[in-house]
Amino acid sequence: MPKRQVFFSFEYYKDNWRAAQIRNMGKVSNDSTFSDNDWESVKKESDLAIKRWIISEMAKRSCIVVLIGATTSTRKWVKYEIEKAYELGKGIVGIYVHGLKDALGNQSSKGANPFYNVITKDGHRLSNYVTDYDTGYVTSKYVYSDIEEHLPDLIEEAIANADKY
């Protein structure tokens, strides 16, 4: 499977620990099938600088992976990133991460689908077309293992389906 350039979108303050777990999958064994963006480098900049960074980073990526936590769907930058990925014809996939533990060992509640509020050019909700993957497991280590197993295929599927929405 080819190595894909992936843009990870997530609610930074509540889910950065969970996001780091997913972003680092495969890096220890050096067999990751994706590489990601570095949100930490820009998060304290102006809105204009953040928009420019998102557009620049998105141009280098073939897919956006939205890591869906309890409040992800309410975050303006997540919505902006999804809209930009849609405008640019990128693959789009969501993965629920509420079952992964945070830095304190806590899981969170399942959040709303962030694709529901994005409307396509033909007036439909993006949520009608984009996969929002939920592992179905409740134990963090099983959630992690399931995401690790399915993430490469979810990315490939999103890229293959990008022209369908």
Describe the residue ranges of each PLM region.
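Short, glycine/charged-enriched secondary-structure capping and boundary segments
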Residues: Q21-N24, K79-I82, Q107-K110
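C-terminal interaction surface of TIR/SEFIR-family domains
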Residues: Q5-F7, R18, A103-Y165
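Low-complexity, flexible helical/coil segments
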Residues: E40-D47, I68-T72, G99-G105, N128-D134
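Conserved beta-strand-loop-alpha-helix hinge of the TIR/SEFIR fold
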Residues: E57-E87, G91-K101
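Glycine-rich loops and low-complexity Gly/Arg-rich segments
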Residues: N30-S35, M58-K60, G89-V93, N117-K121
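Conserved N-terminal substructure of TIR/SEFIR domains
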Residues: M1-K60, H150-Y165
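A broadly tuned preference for mixed-charge, low-complexity surface segments
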Residues: I50-V66, Y116-L126
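Conserved beta-strand termini and adjacent loop/short-helix elements that scaffold enzyme active sites
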Residues: S35-N37, I95, Y129
